[in-house]
Amino acid sequence: MKENKVQQISHKLINIVVFVAIVEYAYLFLHFY
């Protein structure tokens, strides 16, 4: 049970990091081009 919860949390964190990276990249792309 505990391992599954940790896996879920880490998966959510990875999703958030990827989302933020994409948003930042798009923001910079729009501002520079």
Swiss-Prot record:
It is a single-pass membrane protein. Residues 1-12 are cytoplasmic. It is found in: Cell inner membrane. Induction: Constitutively expressed, repressed in minimal glucose medium, by SDS/EDTA (envelope stress), at 10 degrees Celsius and H(2)O(2), induced in minimal glycerol medium, by thiol oxidant diamide, strongly induced at 45 degrees Celsius (at protein level). Transcription is dependent on CRP. Keywords: Cell inner membrane, Cell membrane, Membrane, Stress response, Transmembrane, Transmembrane helix. It comes from the Bacteria. One of its GO terms (cellular component) is plasma membrane. InterPro entries: YkgR-like. The chain crosses the membrane at residues 13-33. NCBIfam families: membrane_YkgR. This is Uncharacterized membrane protein YkgR. It comes from Escherichia coli (strain K12).
